């Protein structure tokens, strides 16, 4: 099992509740989690309910054929950063890189971690 982040991975789902998500077909122009992430791997994800504006960003683990994703760790959400009890409706489920996990170079070429103390300073200088 590896942590995999990939571009253009986006599917639909109609799963409700707080449990694992059944992943549907790839949206037009995108690929499935099976193709882009791979069986039994983990990835950062976003789930967005189109009808209610519920959202969740977290770390998920795919099952053996990448058709189900277990919501392992919640990073942020519309439920005060706790697991979301998703209502009925169509959801977009896609691979993402959460801002709190980003590492980038500042104007001087120094590495800055978004969760680190230097992030606020770098942002204040940039503004």
Residue spans of the language-model regions?
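Elongated alpha-helical scaffolds
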Residues: 54-70
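Acidic surface patches and DE-rich sequence motifs
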Residues: 49, 63, 106
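Ser/Thr/Gly-rich low-complexity blocks that favor extended beta-strand/coil architectures
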Residues: 34-59
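Glycine-rich, low-complexity segments
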Residues: 1-30, 66, 75-127
């Amino acid at each position: 099992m590896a942590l995999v982040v990939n571009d253009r991975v986006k599917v639909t789902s109609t799963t409700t509740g707080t449990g694992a998500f059944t992943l549907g077909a790839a949206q037009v122009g995108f690929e499935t989690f099976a193709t882009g992430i791979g069986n039994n791997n983990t990835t950062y994800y976003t789930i967005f309910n189109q009808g209610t504006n519920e959202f969740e960003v977290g770390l998920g683990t795919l099952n053996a054929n990448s058709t189900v994703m277990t919501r392992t760790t919640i990073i942020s959400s519309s439920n005060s950063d706790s697991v979301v009890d998703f209502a009925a409706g169509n959801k977009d489920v896609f691979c993402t890189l959460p801002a709190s996990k980003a590492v980038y170079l500042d104007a001087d070429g120094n590495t800055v971690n978004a969760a680190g103390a230097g992030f606020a300073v770098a942002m204040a200088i940039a503004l």
